[in-house]
UniProtKB/Swiss-Prot annotation:
SUPFAM superfamilies: PFL-like glycyl radical enzymes. NCBIfam families: PRK05313.1. It comes from Methanosarcina barkeri (strain Fusaro / DSM 804). It comes from the Archaea. This is UPF0210 protein Mbar_A3181.
Amino acid sequence: MYINPKEILETIQMVRMEHLDIRTVTMGISLRDCSHPDIEVFNENIYEKITTRAKELVRTTNEIQSLYGIPIINKRISVTPIAVAAESCRAPDFVSIAKTMDEAAKDAQVDFIGGFSALVHKGATVGDLKLINSIPEALKSTEKVCSSINVATTKTGINMDAVGLMGSIIKKTADLTADRDGIGCAKLVVFANAPEDNPFMAGAFHGIGEPECVINVGVSGPGVVNAAIRELENPNLTEISETIKKTAFKITRMGEMVGREVSRRLGVEFGILDLSLAPTPAIGDSVAAILEAMGLERCGAHGTTAALALLNDAVKKGGAMASSSVGGLSGAFIPVSEDAGMIEAVRAGALNLEKLEAMTSVCSVGLDMIAVPGDTPASTLSAIIADEMAIGVINRKTTAVRVIPAPGKRVGDSVEFGGLLGNAPIMPLSNFSSETFVKRGGRIPAPIQSLTN
């Protein structure tokens, strides 16, 4: 890969002034060879494998950060979905597995570990149900463990039994972490069409089709894109799209360079580069700010969905030109609590849940880090999930829900999670019930592929 001096100077500017960073270097580790009927033996096996494989991850990424001067914010691990790896365990629940994962993550000095996960888009096995029912206690008892459940795919439809169950699981998780504003729910995501190579939390897991061990990288550059657009003089939307493509190209080249060097030093296969524009609470490092730079008075105004579609498509086009290893989610994230512009838009009354839902039809993932009143019924949470899953299934894309029913909070309040998770204003929901619909259960069939209107 040839990189000229001008690109190096541009990258320095991006890092120093525009919040460019590598959001995560995530090591994916297969645990399929760790299976054992005795959960104690299984826990020993996964602890040994995780800590052995990841023992040099943090040191190596820190060295590369110092060498290139490019911040690497998080070092993470993803593992085989535990519901798969632990299927043969005879224990009544999998909480001890989550605790073992947490200990392994702490010993490896990584920020998060993902993969306390199950894939139940067509139905649930005994192991799947053990894992799902263990989630509230597991997230209460751990610091670094993240959980994800895939409940729908375009090929199979939506498992409404699983959707109904996840509303209750989210509610219970919030209650068990009420002393921290329900932060357990910030580490739990429900997917449609979940990718197997996603490096971002809380949805990362090491897919069944993945190799023994792999490095996946997630870049982040909303501030860079925002600055590039604002430097243009009265551009039309075609010119804005071209600028975003060129900027995404540069960001991607930097990310691939770092990812391949980490892989080379660790002797591990390089997997994918996720192009997702992941915002932070820092001013200017915001997807909402990009949309406003295009000409919207506030994110959430009419035209927001179109602007986001332009952004998402241009990022993918620019990134795909720069790398043949693009994967994961790759687009623009719209997590409310993690984006200063989104937070301000909600507080100004410009952005509501219904508009966010429309935006998810064209963005990278879905309803992300949404805080809602603590007294929200579990059935309403399930209905929110069902709506979002439908968007993903019909549009053949990944969608997800990460929602926090903040205990004791009402509309007008806010919750503070700190760090990259930021803070979130409590958003209002419909007062009308979806309970009967959710309780019907069953499966919403896969959509027809030939008649697409």
